[in-house]
């Protein structure tokens, strides 16, 4: 087969943009960007959900560790700190207040699975909220992501990692997300907009 030369290209606006911009598709086209809106691919969400699978040994490992909770009223909470603290101002520092407001939306019987790159900080601050917290440790990123998709509800950070954990969740779940995504050093005129970032049924605080 003859390899066709790419003759057209499209580059998305800077990655601080969360607006959906319709791509002017043409033949032999290269597209590049972050495309941080579900509207680019929501039409094939069912296909994406079916594609996201883990191998049997990995699934069995996770079920052995946490399966006893998954039929209960469980929610994930993702706390991202390490690199966001390093690049303070570029990303919104959600702080403890965001997580408290989010957790308070759920009943006292809610079991919280905590995912974080700073579990030590979470163990120090989150227990004061009165929920039963299960701190997820010793897993790979793929295992964490897959486990997030098995929750009944998701509380996400301003992070595409937990965004995908919620989006790939097949449950009829409740998703709580932060209103602010980028920090003040991101100067794009639409950097604080999230209308195209989150599906309509997600709650923002």
Q: What kind of feature is each model-predicted range?
A:
Residues 103-186, 191:
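Donor-binding and catalytic core of enzymes assembling or modifying cell-surface/extracellular glycoconjugates
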Residues 16-17, 27, 110, 130, ...:
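A generic alpha-helix propensity feature with a strong bias for hydrophobic helices
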């Amino acid at each position: 087969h003859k390899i066709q030369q790419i003759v057209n290209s499209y580059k998305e606006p800077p990655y601080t943009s969360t607006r959906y911009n319709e791509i002017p598709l043409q033949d032999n086209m290269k597209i590049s960007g972050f495309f941080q809106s579900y509207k680019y691919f929501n039409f094939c969400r069912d296909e994406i959900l079916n594609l996201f699978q883990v191998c049997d040994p990995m699934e069995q490992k996770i079920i052995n560790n946490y399966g006893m909770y998954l039929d209960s009223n469980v929610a994930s909470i993702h706390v991202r700190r390490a690199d966001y603290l390093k690049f303070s101002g570029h990303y919104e520092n959600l702080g403890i207040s965001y997580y408290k407001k989010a957790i308070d939306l759920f009943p006292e019987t809610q079991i919280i699975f905590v995912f974080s790159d700073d579990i030590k900080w979470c163990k120090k601050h989150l227990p004061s909220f009165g929920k039963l917290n299960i701190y997820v440790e010793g897993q790979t990123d793929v295992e964490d992501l897959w486990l997030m998709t098995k929750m009944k509800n998701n509380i996400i950070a301003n992070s595409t990692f937990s965004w995908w954990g919620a989006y790939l969740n097949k449950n009829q779940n409740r998703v709580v997300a932060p209103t602010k995504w980028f920090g003040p050093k991101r100067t794009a005129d639409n950097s604080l907009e999230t209308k195209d970032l989150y599906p309509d049924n997600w709650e923002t605080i």
